């Protein structure tokens, strides 16, 4: 998901019984996506332990300090960056997670249309930008040049 999509989530977007979440994306796009069990459990833990009960805010992710309002996309990016630093990953932005997910799916054998569907891209050309491969991966799948070394 994009940082802006995470920031826009409301409590009403989580459909617990159906195991789904409604995501409002770019271009007024609205999709109901599967909610993996581990993600649902993490959201439950967040709501129980961290979500301020004193707020009237319907946003799923709310600032923990006053004013108790919805996180912005910049706030989501800040949370991701702080978690990456704590994990020893250095500087990592929220959008980098989309690039990494696309690359990992590609390496696992997913097709560009499949990756585009997961990332919810309208155009394959957009997915191709995200699905970057490294030179080593290209060497492994490239056919040897005739007369060259294998």
Model-inferred region functions:
Residues 1-3, 31, 48-52, 98, ...:
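Short, cationic motifs built from Arg/Lys/His that form the positively charged side of catalytic pockets
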Residues 1-42:
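Conserved tyrosine-mediated DNA breakage-rejoining catalytic core shared by Y-recombinases
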Residues 14-16, 72, 89-91, 110-129, ...:
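Short, polar N-cap/turn motifs at the start of nucleic acid-interacting alpha helices
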Residues 19, 32, 56-57, 65, ...:
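A cross-kingdom feature marking solvent-exposed beta-strand/loop segments within repeated
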Residues 25-45, 58-79:
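C-terminal catalytic core of Y-nucleophile DNA break-rejoin enzymes
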Residues 33, 77-117:
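Short, basic (Lys/Arg/His-rich) helix/loop patches that form interaction surfaces
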Residues 46, 132-150:
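DNA/chromatin major-groove-contacting recognition/catalytic segments
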């Amino acid at each position: 998901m994009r940082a802006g999509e995470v920031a826009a989530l409301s409590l009403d977007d989580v459909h617990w019984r159906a195991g789904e979440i409604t995501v409002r994306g770019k271009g007024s796009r609205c999709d109901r996506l599967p909610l993996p069990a581990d993600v649902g459990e993490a959201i439950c833990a967040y709501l129980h332990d961290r979500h301020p009960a004193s707020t009237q805010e319907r946003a799923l992710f709310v600032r923990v300090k006053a004013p108790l309002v919805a996180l912005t996309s910049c706030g989501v990016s800040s949370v991701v960056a702080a978690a990456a630093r704590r994990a020893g990953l250095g500087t990592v932005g929220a959008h980098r997670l989309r690039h990494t997910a696309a690359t990992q799916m590609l390496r696992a054998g997913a097709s560009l249309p499949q990756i585009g569907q997961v990332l919810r891209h309208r155009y394959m050309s957009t997915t191709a930008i995200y699905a970057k491969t490294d030179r080593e991966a290209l060497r492994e799948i490239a056919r040897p040049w005739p007369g060259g070394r294998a």
